[in-house]
């Protein structure tokens, strides 16, 4: 998911010194499977980075069956379950690339896990991001601009969703910078905690 919380739109606008511009419709973008890592693994900051690497705690929605042109009313029938994602972002590269590909898809920039839970309400998750034990963000999936069902409906109009596809549902804030030595945790109620360690590329 592109911008999906008003707080994130506003925080990123402040970073640019601009007025917030709220999207008129869901704006999907792509994340590389090669950037995925699991819990307790290392987030490797590339040598070329000069700071501005930030976490984004996100609800992750795992598709369970093939979905094409589905309605919002039955969209959640295509969900297998829910997990945790951390959409690591290098803000300078992100801002210089209209596709956001470089700033979002570096190796190890997509921590995911540790569990997938089923039979829960995706609109009622509490999402907490911690930096070295200090809470950076604390928000609810109820505050999404567009909910999970809307995203599945919209995406399935243009492309077939397949079992194992994962939708990352956006974040609320614009967090501070991470540096090597930091520990980043994303906790989502009823799912668990995704924990990763920030290191520099050797």
Which residue ranges define each predicted feature?
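Short, conserved beta-strand element in jelly-roll/cupin
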Residues: 29, 60-65, 151-153, 164
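Structural motif
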Residues: 26-28, 34-35, 42, 58-60, ...
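Extended, compositionally biased flexible segments
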Residues: 1-48
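Solvent-exposed alpha-helices and their adjacent loops that cap or buttress functional pockets
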Residues: 19-22, 28, 35-37, 50-55, ...
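Non-heme Fe(II) oxygenase catalytic core, chiefly the N-lobe of the double-stranded beta-helix
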Residues: 38-75, 80, 85-88
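Catalytic-pocket segment enriched in acidic/His residues
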Residues: 4, 8-10, 91-202
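Short beta-strand-to-turn element immediately C-terminal to the catalytic PLP-Schiff-base lysine
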Residues: 11, 30, 39, 46, ...
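A short secondary-structure junction signal
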Residues: 10-12, 39-42, 48, 70-75, ...
């Amino acid at each position: 998911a592109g911008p999906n919380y008003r707080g994130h739109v506003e925080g990123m606008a402040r970073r640019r010194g601009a007025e917030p511009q709220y999207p008129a419709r869901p704006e999907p973008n792509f994340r590389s499977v090669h950037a995925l890592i699991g819990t307790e693994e290392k987030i490797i900051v590339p040598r070329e980075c000069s700071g501005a690497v930030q976490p984004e705690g996100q609800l992750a929605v795992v598709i369970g069956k093939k979905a094409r042109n589905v309605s919002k009313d039955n969209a959640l029938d295509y969900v297998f379950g829910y997990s945790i994602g951390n959409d690591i972002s290098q803000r300078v590269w992100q801002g210089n690339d209209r596709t956001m590909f470089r700033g979002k898809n570096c190796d190890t920039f997509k921590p995911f896990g540790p569990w997938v839970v089923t039979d829960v309400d995706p609109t009622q998750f509490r999402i907490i991001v911690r930096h070295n034990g200090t809470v950076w963000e604390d928000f609810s999936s109820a505050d999404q601009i567009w909910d999970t069902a809307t995203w599945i409906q919209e995406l399935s109009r243009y492309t077939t969703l397949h079992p194992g596809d994962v939708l990352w549902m956006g974040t609320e804030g614009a967090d501070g910078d991470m540096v090597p030595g930091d520990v980043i945790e994303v906790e989502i109620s009823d799912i668990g905690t995704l924990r990763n360690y920030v290191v520099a590329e050797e």
